[in-house]
Design a protein with these regions (language model features):
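ATP-binding N-lobe of GHMP and related small-molecule kinases
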Residues: 1-89, 107-112, 143, 170, ...
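ATP-dependent small-molecule kinase catalytic core of the GHMP/sugar-kinase superfamily
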Residues: 2-9, 111-192
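Predominant activation on well-ordered alpha-helical scaffold segments within soluble catalytic domains
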Residues: 7, 59, 63, 99-102, ...
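DPxDG-like acidic metal-binding loop motif
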Residues: 58, 89-116, 127, 131-135
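N-terminal hydrophobic or amphipathic segments with adjacent small-residue motifs
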Residues: 84-88, 104, 120, 153-155
Length: 192
């Protein structure tokens, strides 16, 4: 399946994308044949070459939230991504965008999901998403999850990367981040 067993420390850094999510409710417009109103998903980004459809993890995150919690909803999810994290650099840029969408819809739809529940949803989309959920829960006080026992800036990741144990100490170090002009996908790195 392309996944490998690992043991590593994951640490948040200050580099981030800006992800804005807006929910606009529609009133009984565009119902399908079963009388159920659909939820549409639209993604925009400052990078014209980034996918805006189901190939994008932010889109996939909105789709999984709609599948699990969107029954009876009618409206549009608009996701605007301003990329700063280099793509194909091993920095979980797409994963963090997906995590941000899960958090946003949790708040916008008043679902009250905790970090564990969000991580369970996120792990079905990718191995880096649960850690991104944990880090965003700790860093973004507006989410109301910073006191959750799984909210953390640093974690020990085992298994395929989705088994996470928060580390309260974090890594205290300086970091120089460089990105060469090439990119390698996670699937290529772990594909062997």
């Amino acid at each position: 399946n392309g996944y490998h067993q690992l043991e590593m420390v994951m640490q948040q850094i200050l580099l981030h994308d800006d992800v804005a999510v807006k929910w606009t409710e529609a009133l009984d417009e565009g119902q399908d044949r079963k009388g159920e109103a659909p939820v549409t998903i639209r993604v925009s980004t400052n990078k014209p070459w980034l996918p805006r459809d189901e190939r994008n993890l932010a889109y996939k995150a909105a789709a999984i939230m709609t599948e699990h919690y969107g029954k009876g909803l009618c409206g549009e999810i608009r996701i605007d991504i301003k990329k700063r994290i280099p793509v194909a650099a091993g920095l979980a840029g797409g994963s963090s965008n997906g995590a941000a969408v899960l958090h946003a819809l949790n708040v916008l739809w008043n679902l009250g999901l905790d970090v564990r529940q969000l991580c369970a949803l996120g792990s079905s989309l990718g191995s880096d998403i649960p850690f991104s959920i944990m880090g965003q829960a700790k860093a973004n006080l507006e989410l109301g999850l910073s006191k959750d026992r799984l909210a953390a800036h640093c974690a020990l990741a085992t298994g395929t990367g989705t088994e996470l144990e928060p580390l309260s100490c974090g890594l205290k170090s300086y970091l120089l981040l460089t990105k060469p002009p090439i990119g390698v996908s996670t699937a290529e790195v772990y594909g062997g």
